[in-house]
């Protein structure tokens, strides 16, 4: 009896551990977090030259951690005046080149990732931030793209190479290129992200305020996913209660 009881307990423990593993595996594969890819085209000379060469609508790519694009990173010029003083930067859509050029056209893409991938993205970006002074712009890599030959140098990136590198290192499956060959157009034609806005960058936050609800903390709620479903459920309950009170 004791042996049978012990065997049953062992089976229960094994079954419990198996269920926990299944739950953890499901959590690791569920895409519950978002990052954002901003594709843009300003009226600067480098942007116009790139557009003329590529014949593509966008010449620059950035990676953001929030829908308002408040925390956003890329490789670009560090100041407004000197186009050759470039490196890893934190971008602001209301300052710098974006703030100066109110006619900047853009495309905002939302990419759902797993919690584990999101954690890795944050870790990679933190490394970039800590070593910011080491990074330069991969000018030679741009010519490599023209020749279809990836030129990847440590601490040197161009904008779309940087975005691809971060996502790729975090385990996000993309379009099977080397980071040194990634172009803004690749993100535009990639079918994984959702298009949430296309138009003038200057009007983007106004668009958000008119089309996205906010939670009690003043943060925009995604229009798909668990948070938005919960928001809609809460709104439905409130509407039912209001209707009942009026009857």
Regions found by a protein language model. Give the residues of each.
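Cysteine-nucleophile amide-bond enzymes
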Residues: 2-247
